[in-house]
Amino acid sequence: MIRQCLHLTTSPLLLLLLIALSSIGTVVAKSDGPKIASIQLETEPSMPFYFENSDTVLFLRLDTGEVYQSFDGGVEWKVLGKDHETEGETAGLANGAVMIQAHPYDNQKAYILGRHGVHWVTTDQGKTWREFEVPAAPSMFNEPLRFHGEDSGKVIFQGERCSAFACVETSYYTRNNFETVKPMRDTARGCMWAVATPGFADSTTEHAEEIRDRVLCIVHGLKNPFASAYRLVYSDSFFEDDQDGIEAKLNEGRPVAGIINAAARTKYIVAAAKSQGTDELAMFVTDDAITWHRAEFGNHKIEESAYTVLEGTNYSIEVDVMNTDRSTNMGVLFTSNSNGTYFTRNIEHTNRDMSGLVDFEKIAGVQGIVLVNVVDNWEEIENDPKADRKVISKISFDDGRTFQSLKVKDKDLHLHSVTAFENIGRVFSSPAPGIVMGVGNTGTHLKSYTKDGDLYVSDDAGVTWRLALEKPHKYEIGNKGAIIMAIKDNDKPTKKIQYSINHGKDWETAELDREIIPYFLTTTPDSTSLKFMLVGYVEDPADWYIYAIDFEGLHERECKDSDFENWPARLDENGEPDCLMGHKQFYRRRKSDANCFITETMFKTPKPEFKSCKCTAEDFECDYNFVRSEDRKECVPATILKAPEGTCKNDDDTFKGPSGWRLIPGNVCTRDGAVELDKEIDRPCKDALKTPSGDSKAVSSTANYIETEMFGEFFYLERAGSSRGEDETIIMRTTDGKLYVTHDHGKSWTHELKDVKIQQIAPHRYLNDRAFFLTSGKKQYYTINRAESFDAFSAPAEVNPSGLTLGYHEEFKDWMIWTGPGECSHGECPKVSFISKHRGDDWEILLRAVEKCEFMAREDRKDSGSLIFCDQHEGEKVDGQRMLVTSNDFFATSTTPLTNIIDFATMAEFIIIATRNPEKENSLKVDASVNGVEFADAEFPYNLEVPVQLAYTVLDSSTHSVFLHVTANNKMDQSYGSIIKSNSNGTSYVLSLNDVNRNNGGYVDFEKLPGLEGVALANVVSNTKNVEKGSEKKLTSMITHNDGSQWTLIPPPAKDSEGKPYSCGSDGKPTDKCSLHLHGYTERRDPRDSFGSASAIGLLFGVGNVGESLGSKSEASTFFSSDGGISWKEVKKGNYMWKFGDQGSVLVLVEELKPTRDIYFSTDEGDTWEKYQFSEKEVTVQSLSTVPSGTSKNFLIWGKETGSSKLVTINLDFSGLRDRTCNLDEDTGESEDYYLWEPKHPLQEGNCLFGHVEQYHRKKPSSHCWNDWSEAHVHRISHNCTCTEEDYECDYNYERQTDGSCALVPGLLKPNAIDYCRENPEAIEYWEPTGYRRIPLTTCQGGKNLDRWVSRPCPSHEEEYQRKHGPSGAVIFFAIIVPITIAVAAGYWVYTRWDGKFGQIRLGDGGAQSFVTSRGDSPFITIPVAIIAGTVAAVKVLPLLVMSLWRSVTGYVRIPGRRGPRPYATRDAFAARRGDYTHVVDDEDELLGDDEFEDEEGDERN
């Protein structure tokens, strides 16, 4: 309901007199107050929107979706589509609007966005409206409209298309203001124009034509749907010529993954990236949409949601970076140089709030003046965040170089700013030149707004201030400063408004028709109008009022030239006009005491005048690759300078080089006779870049002796891609509890926490910079900065003696779960899980009598932020039946979806639970879930001949399917079983491979190759019948290239490393008598090692032999493949360890556990090998490690000097081999240094693998350069292929025949396909079974359709079936839609997300051990294991043994040798082994029963 009224503040007698005087022609037409009109609403309105330079205003009624429009500043209102006489297509507008958006660069245009794909546009400030349609709702996550900075007809519409299960962000574009609309592409975080602002258009004239239609979009990764793989791509043809677009070269000419946001600011585009494994952001900036640079903030770290890009200038970017804990909310203000690359610190301890708002504002229209609030007692706040903060105000008149206090005469003034703003629009200033206002107080610091606040005003841009009105007021400036209006704002009703016509020196009063509590006061954005709008409310009854207040009648006189002054915008310390960016700035401004209004040019924004100055030092900035010195007086090189060719023959020579300075682009200072800091200077050659020699002499080695009995566990705290820094940090615990740290990859070590005995290291699963150091007591230690410093907290219980102690949250970095023994008087104390949301500062109990609790948060698992799973004993009794208990509110409420469980494990998107089978005694069964809410029984194939399921091992799920090993024989030293593979939700399994080898510990000879889709190696027992009779196992190695659908023998090389043919001679083709066999996971001394590395795609090593079966490891040779396992060659006789460096640029081999002083390395993909002597004395090498990503040029040998007890680490540094970074043309993918490598299937043509051709960059073996890239990068998915037989596998209850076809298992009936309809009531149709199902990983299109031949309508959906043809998209046990990219990328998620959760649970009465890996960079990790005392920490994907009883987990991780438990090693060793498995084991067997391990365990117990 709307009620309108109009009233004047003049008396009736005076009004009659004025009318009479007017009727006789007198010029006296002056009123004593403003005209006031109002309307009443029943609900709160949205913020009003003004058309700039007009009195036309709109607002949206939030409850009804009605749009109100006024052409007279709010006096008269009409509802568009109902009672509006405006021309145009507005009929559908009556109740259909969700938002109003102005065009930011064209004051004639605005847009009303509707709910149902129908929207409206005006091009004449609301006089007419035109309807247009876009088949998508406005995006809820991205700005719905993105505008072009030069052509106002170009607009990007960002919407979302939703089905019953998911929404897809998509972008459309128009080039004619929605006369026509075209789809552009699906996105992850939306699209924007390269020319996104007028300032960008003005500054890029050189490339104007090239980027005129350029669009930038943040899209999903090619193989990974998660935010860590988001890419920034661009297109100059709206993605019509190239659907995927071209990746922007953000960092040194190369693309960057993990783009989370991109935005335009003045003449810059800023993009932020965050890599997996860090909370640090990298910011990239461009000023031409072509060349990008990483922004440098010195030693300051930028974190997600911990920085704010502020209002900048046309020559710099302002960024406030939070440099404290979020509870204290203080920051550092930085200003960039002119290209946005190097940022300098302006002022520290800026005041921020929890939402990231910063107390910062540039004074509108005046260059160089900035108002900020800082925390004066910052030290007290850092020590006690709950202490009262003392905020003070500061102002700068020189672009932030210096700051000073605000002054009211001789008193300091402090003003409430952005974080406490009580109005809309700017806080202090407006386009009215020099008029600045604020609410605050004088004194030592800022006090309460309501109790102590007064209104202050300055009319000289903040140089001097005076009290305007007592008590806090909302305020607005109109008519370019000629009128100021205010209303008291102390949370009490008022009807009095006040106004001033002389810059706030004197005030007049007018009254409203009722008392209201003011909500906001506003006027036109350019502050040119004489009309104001006030919105307020009354509490009883709850009504809202909108007041239009018109001051046009206060004066009749139009201002003349004599009423204006030429006002200097900035003054120096002498009171003279000051220079900035090479000029002085002036405004033609109405004098404060002029008795007039500016009516003739009312709606024209004031424009400044400029006068040039001579160049001074302040007009220069640091040039590219230079940064300010500490005293900010010089520009010093940020990198080593390269001397020109032909110079620097001796170190004593000099060469002409850059001074380090350049004139700030856009600076207009006069250079004649002025300072010239940018002239070239002489630079010493000794500081220039030296050229490496390029041979083995350039490799260096550094040895360090560690005084300890034995190495323990160690972890690389590797920097992620967006993390700035060059250190290569390792933390290492010795078996006697000492902690050692190196920041230079083992070249030097320091002993930390010297008075503390560390029992375990528990690296943070999701953040590489963090690690926790657990002791036997309750005081625990941790680092959050890569072991630069250490802090402590008090744990709520001691370390868990038999399982995981610490659990981490994927999103909230300070959330932790601690599980440990509770307090009891006798017997075995039940374990208790606690939660802390503040990194251990405080703890609350989650559940008692648990085995473990884990966070289940996952980026693609809806509403899982607070989801927790616990394995709890019924009745909170130690001997109570175990049950799965879940909660989304920290167990204020909970559910119990499964009882009688053995354990649960998480693998990528899958949650696998082993429970006792109620229908079969002493047998287990598997349940699965994807969303953590709905669970379903797993259906095993009937041809799986395992009558009693006593043991499972959950293997890899990196290809959107679970691989599960079901044990057929679990007798000591005879164990083997079948590998079955699930569908996309983990519930329906088909047989993949029989008789796969399993060891006594429940681990399996099965490994997916890092980075290669669908390629896996396995060892099978070829003599199972003899094994059943007690014979030793004979193992045969097999390989699959299509994700386990088909397995083949591994082809042997034709000749050995000496050029001799193998005795079994097969001409390179595998036969039963002659194939390559490789020692697998169950035989590794370091369980975290892998055949390959995710960063060196397709490069593989293995130790084994050629023959009929796998021979002794002592007689093995070392083999290498460069094509993903399709072909192999022997590279060395003997058993060697291997590692990959610089993404495969350097391959290193060292003989395992034999005295040696030499390593071998190759820089040409294994074609040739060079020997390097790393020690004068022979060393027995126990492990070889490098950073988990395999991108370092440093390696570390762990060993013991032969003939002595000295333990030694030896760093190998290969960085001197090459002197340049390889050149890459990302647009074509090839260059003089790179070629494109395509994985392929050995039996398929055209390099199609899983329905597409994938291309990777590979450095040419002949190129003498470094990759210097932090992650393996897919160049592109060049195209999808048509479907062939290789894109299908046998369906449930079908098996592969000798001719390759799939047939029903004999004796079984076809599955009842209509069950699908019963399980999915919303499904429209089902398909008759064909015996085939698509491999979840494939993206093929068209071609052979083997899985869907005949469809049928589901009962009661016949009519819908007729209307819709195609699959329903539901899955077996609950509805879920998973994009193809998820299917392709699940392994990458495993690699990046699940670093450190890899546990094992065993049966029987023996001790148990947990296996752990450190973090690595391997997308398709399988089977990592290593032993760690008392807890499972830092692994990528848990192998988990689920069995009938829970057993304790004990032991230590250390370098193999001398009867000690297993170590932690490198990327491939270390964390590389990321995603492996979990097992469920039998009742009687000792797991990890291998003699070596049992002895090691015994040693540790003793």
Curated annotation (Swiss-Prot):
InterPro entries, alphabetically?
Answer: Sortilin_C, Sortilin_N, VPS10, VPS10-sortilin, WD40/YVTN_repeat-like_dom_sf
Q: Which SUPFAM superfamilies match?
A: Oligoxyloglucan reducing end-specific cellobiohydrolase (SSF110296)
Q: Which UniProt keywords apply?
A: Glycoprotein, Golgi apparatus, Membrane, Protein transport, Receptor, Repeat, Signal, Transmembrane, Transmembrane helix, Transport
Membrane topology per the record?
Answer: Multi-pass membrane protein
Q: Which residues are glycosylated?
A: N314, N339, N985, N1280
Compartment(s): Golgi apparatus, trans-Golgi network membrane; Prevacuolar compartment membrane
**Alphabetical list of Gene3D superfamilies matching this protein:** 2.10.70.80, 3.30.60.270, YVTN repeat-like/Quinoprotein amine dehydrogenase
Query: Where is it found, in Gene Ontology cellular component terms?
Result: cytosol; Golgi apparatus; membrane
User: Is Transmembrane helix given among the entry's keywords?
Assistant: yes
The signal peptide stretch is: 1-29
Chief localisation class: Golgi
User: What is the top-level taxon of the source organism?
Assistant: Eukaryota
Cytoplasmic domain ranges by topology: 1391-1422
Topological domain spans for side Lumenal: 30-1369, 1444-1502
The transmembrane segments are 1370-1390, 1423-1443
- Please list the residue ranges covered by the BNR repeats: 68-78, 120-130, 395-404, 456-466, 498-508, 740-750, 1119-1129, 1160-1171
Q: Name one GO biological process term.
A: Golgi to vacuole transport
Q: Which Pfam families match?
A: Sortilin-Vps10, Sortilin_C
Check the record and name the CDD domains matching this protein: Sialidase_non-viral
Q: What is stated as this protein's family in its record?
A: Belongs to the VPS10-related sortilin family.
Q: What role does it play?
A: Functions as a sorting receptor in the Golgi compartment required for the intracellular sorting and delivery of soluble vacuolar proteins, like carboxypeptidase Y (CPY) and proteinase A. Executes multiple rounds of sorting by cycling between the late Golgi and a prevacuolar endosome-like compartment.
Name by which UniProt lists this protein: Vacuolar protein sorting/targeting protein 10
Q: Which organism is it from?
A: Talaromyces stipitatus (strain ATCC 10500 / CBS 375.48 / QM 6759 / NRRL 1006)
The lineage, from the top, is: Eukaryota, Fungi, Dikarya, Ascomycota, Pezizomycotina
